[in-house]
Amino acid sequence: MRERTSRRIMQRFTIHDLAAIIDARAASGGDASYTRKLLDKGPAHCARKLGEEAVETIIAAVEKDRHHLIAEGADLMFHFLVLLKASGVTLQDVEAVLAQRTAISGLEEKAARNRD
């Protein structure tokens, strides 16, 4: 029964839930909060951590290690959201750009970006 409950909870967990957790930890934090410690070190530190996680994700993909890729992908998403928070950017800001980009073809969007 517990496994089924756990699976149901995981199916409902979204990136928005993770962003909300990061927001809450940023607000309350404390010595025990890894998130708060990252944020306290500033955007440059958060960017370096994101880079480290990106490399680990790439390695997992190249090695075709599915389990490791999933775990590193989760770390990558977490650190990306922390970097956004540290930089004063919201997930909704990123989603708005994605919505604009998906309104036209990828090639048209890329060409428009290159002109800017």
From Swiss-Prot:
GO terms for cellular component: cytoplasm. SUPFAM superfamilies: all-alpha NTP pyrophosphatases. It is found in: Cytoplasm. Pathway: Amino-acid biosynthesis; L-histidine biosynthesis; L-histidine from 5-phospho-alpha-D-ribose 1-diphosphate: step 2/9. GO terms for biological process: L-histidine biosynthetic process. One of its GO terms (molecular function) is ATP binding. Pfam families: PRA-PH. Belongs to the PRA-PH family. NCBIfam families: histidine_hisI, PRK00400.1-5. This is Phosphoribosyl-ATP pyrophosphatase. It comes from Nitrobacter winogradskyi (strain ATCC 25391 / DSM 10237 / CIP 104748 / NCIMB 11846 / Nb-255).
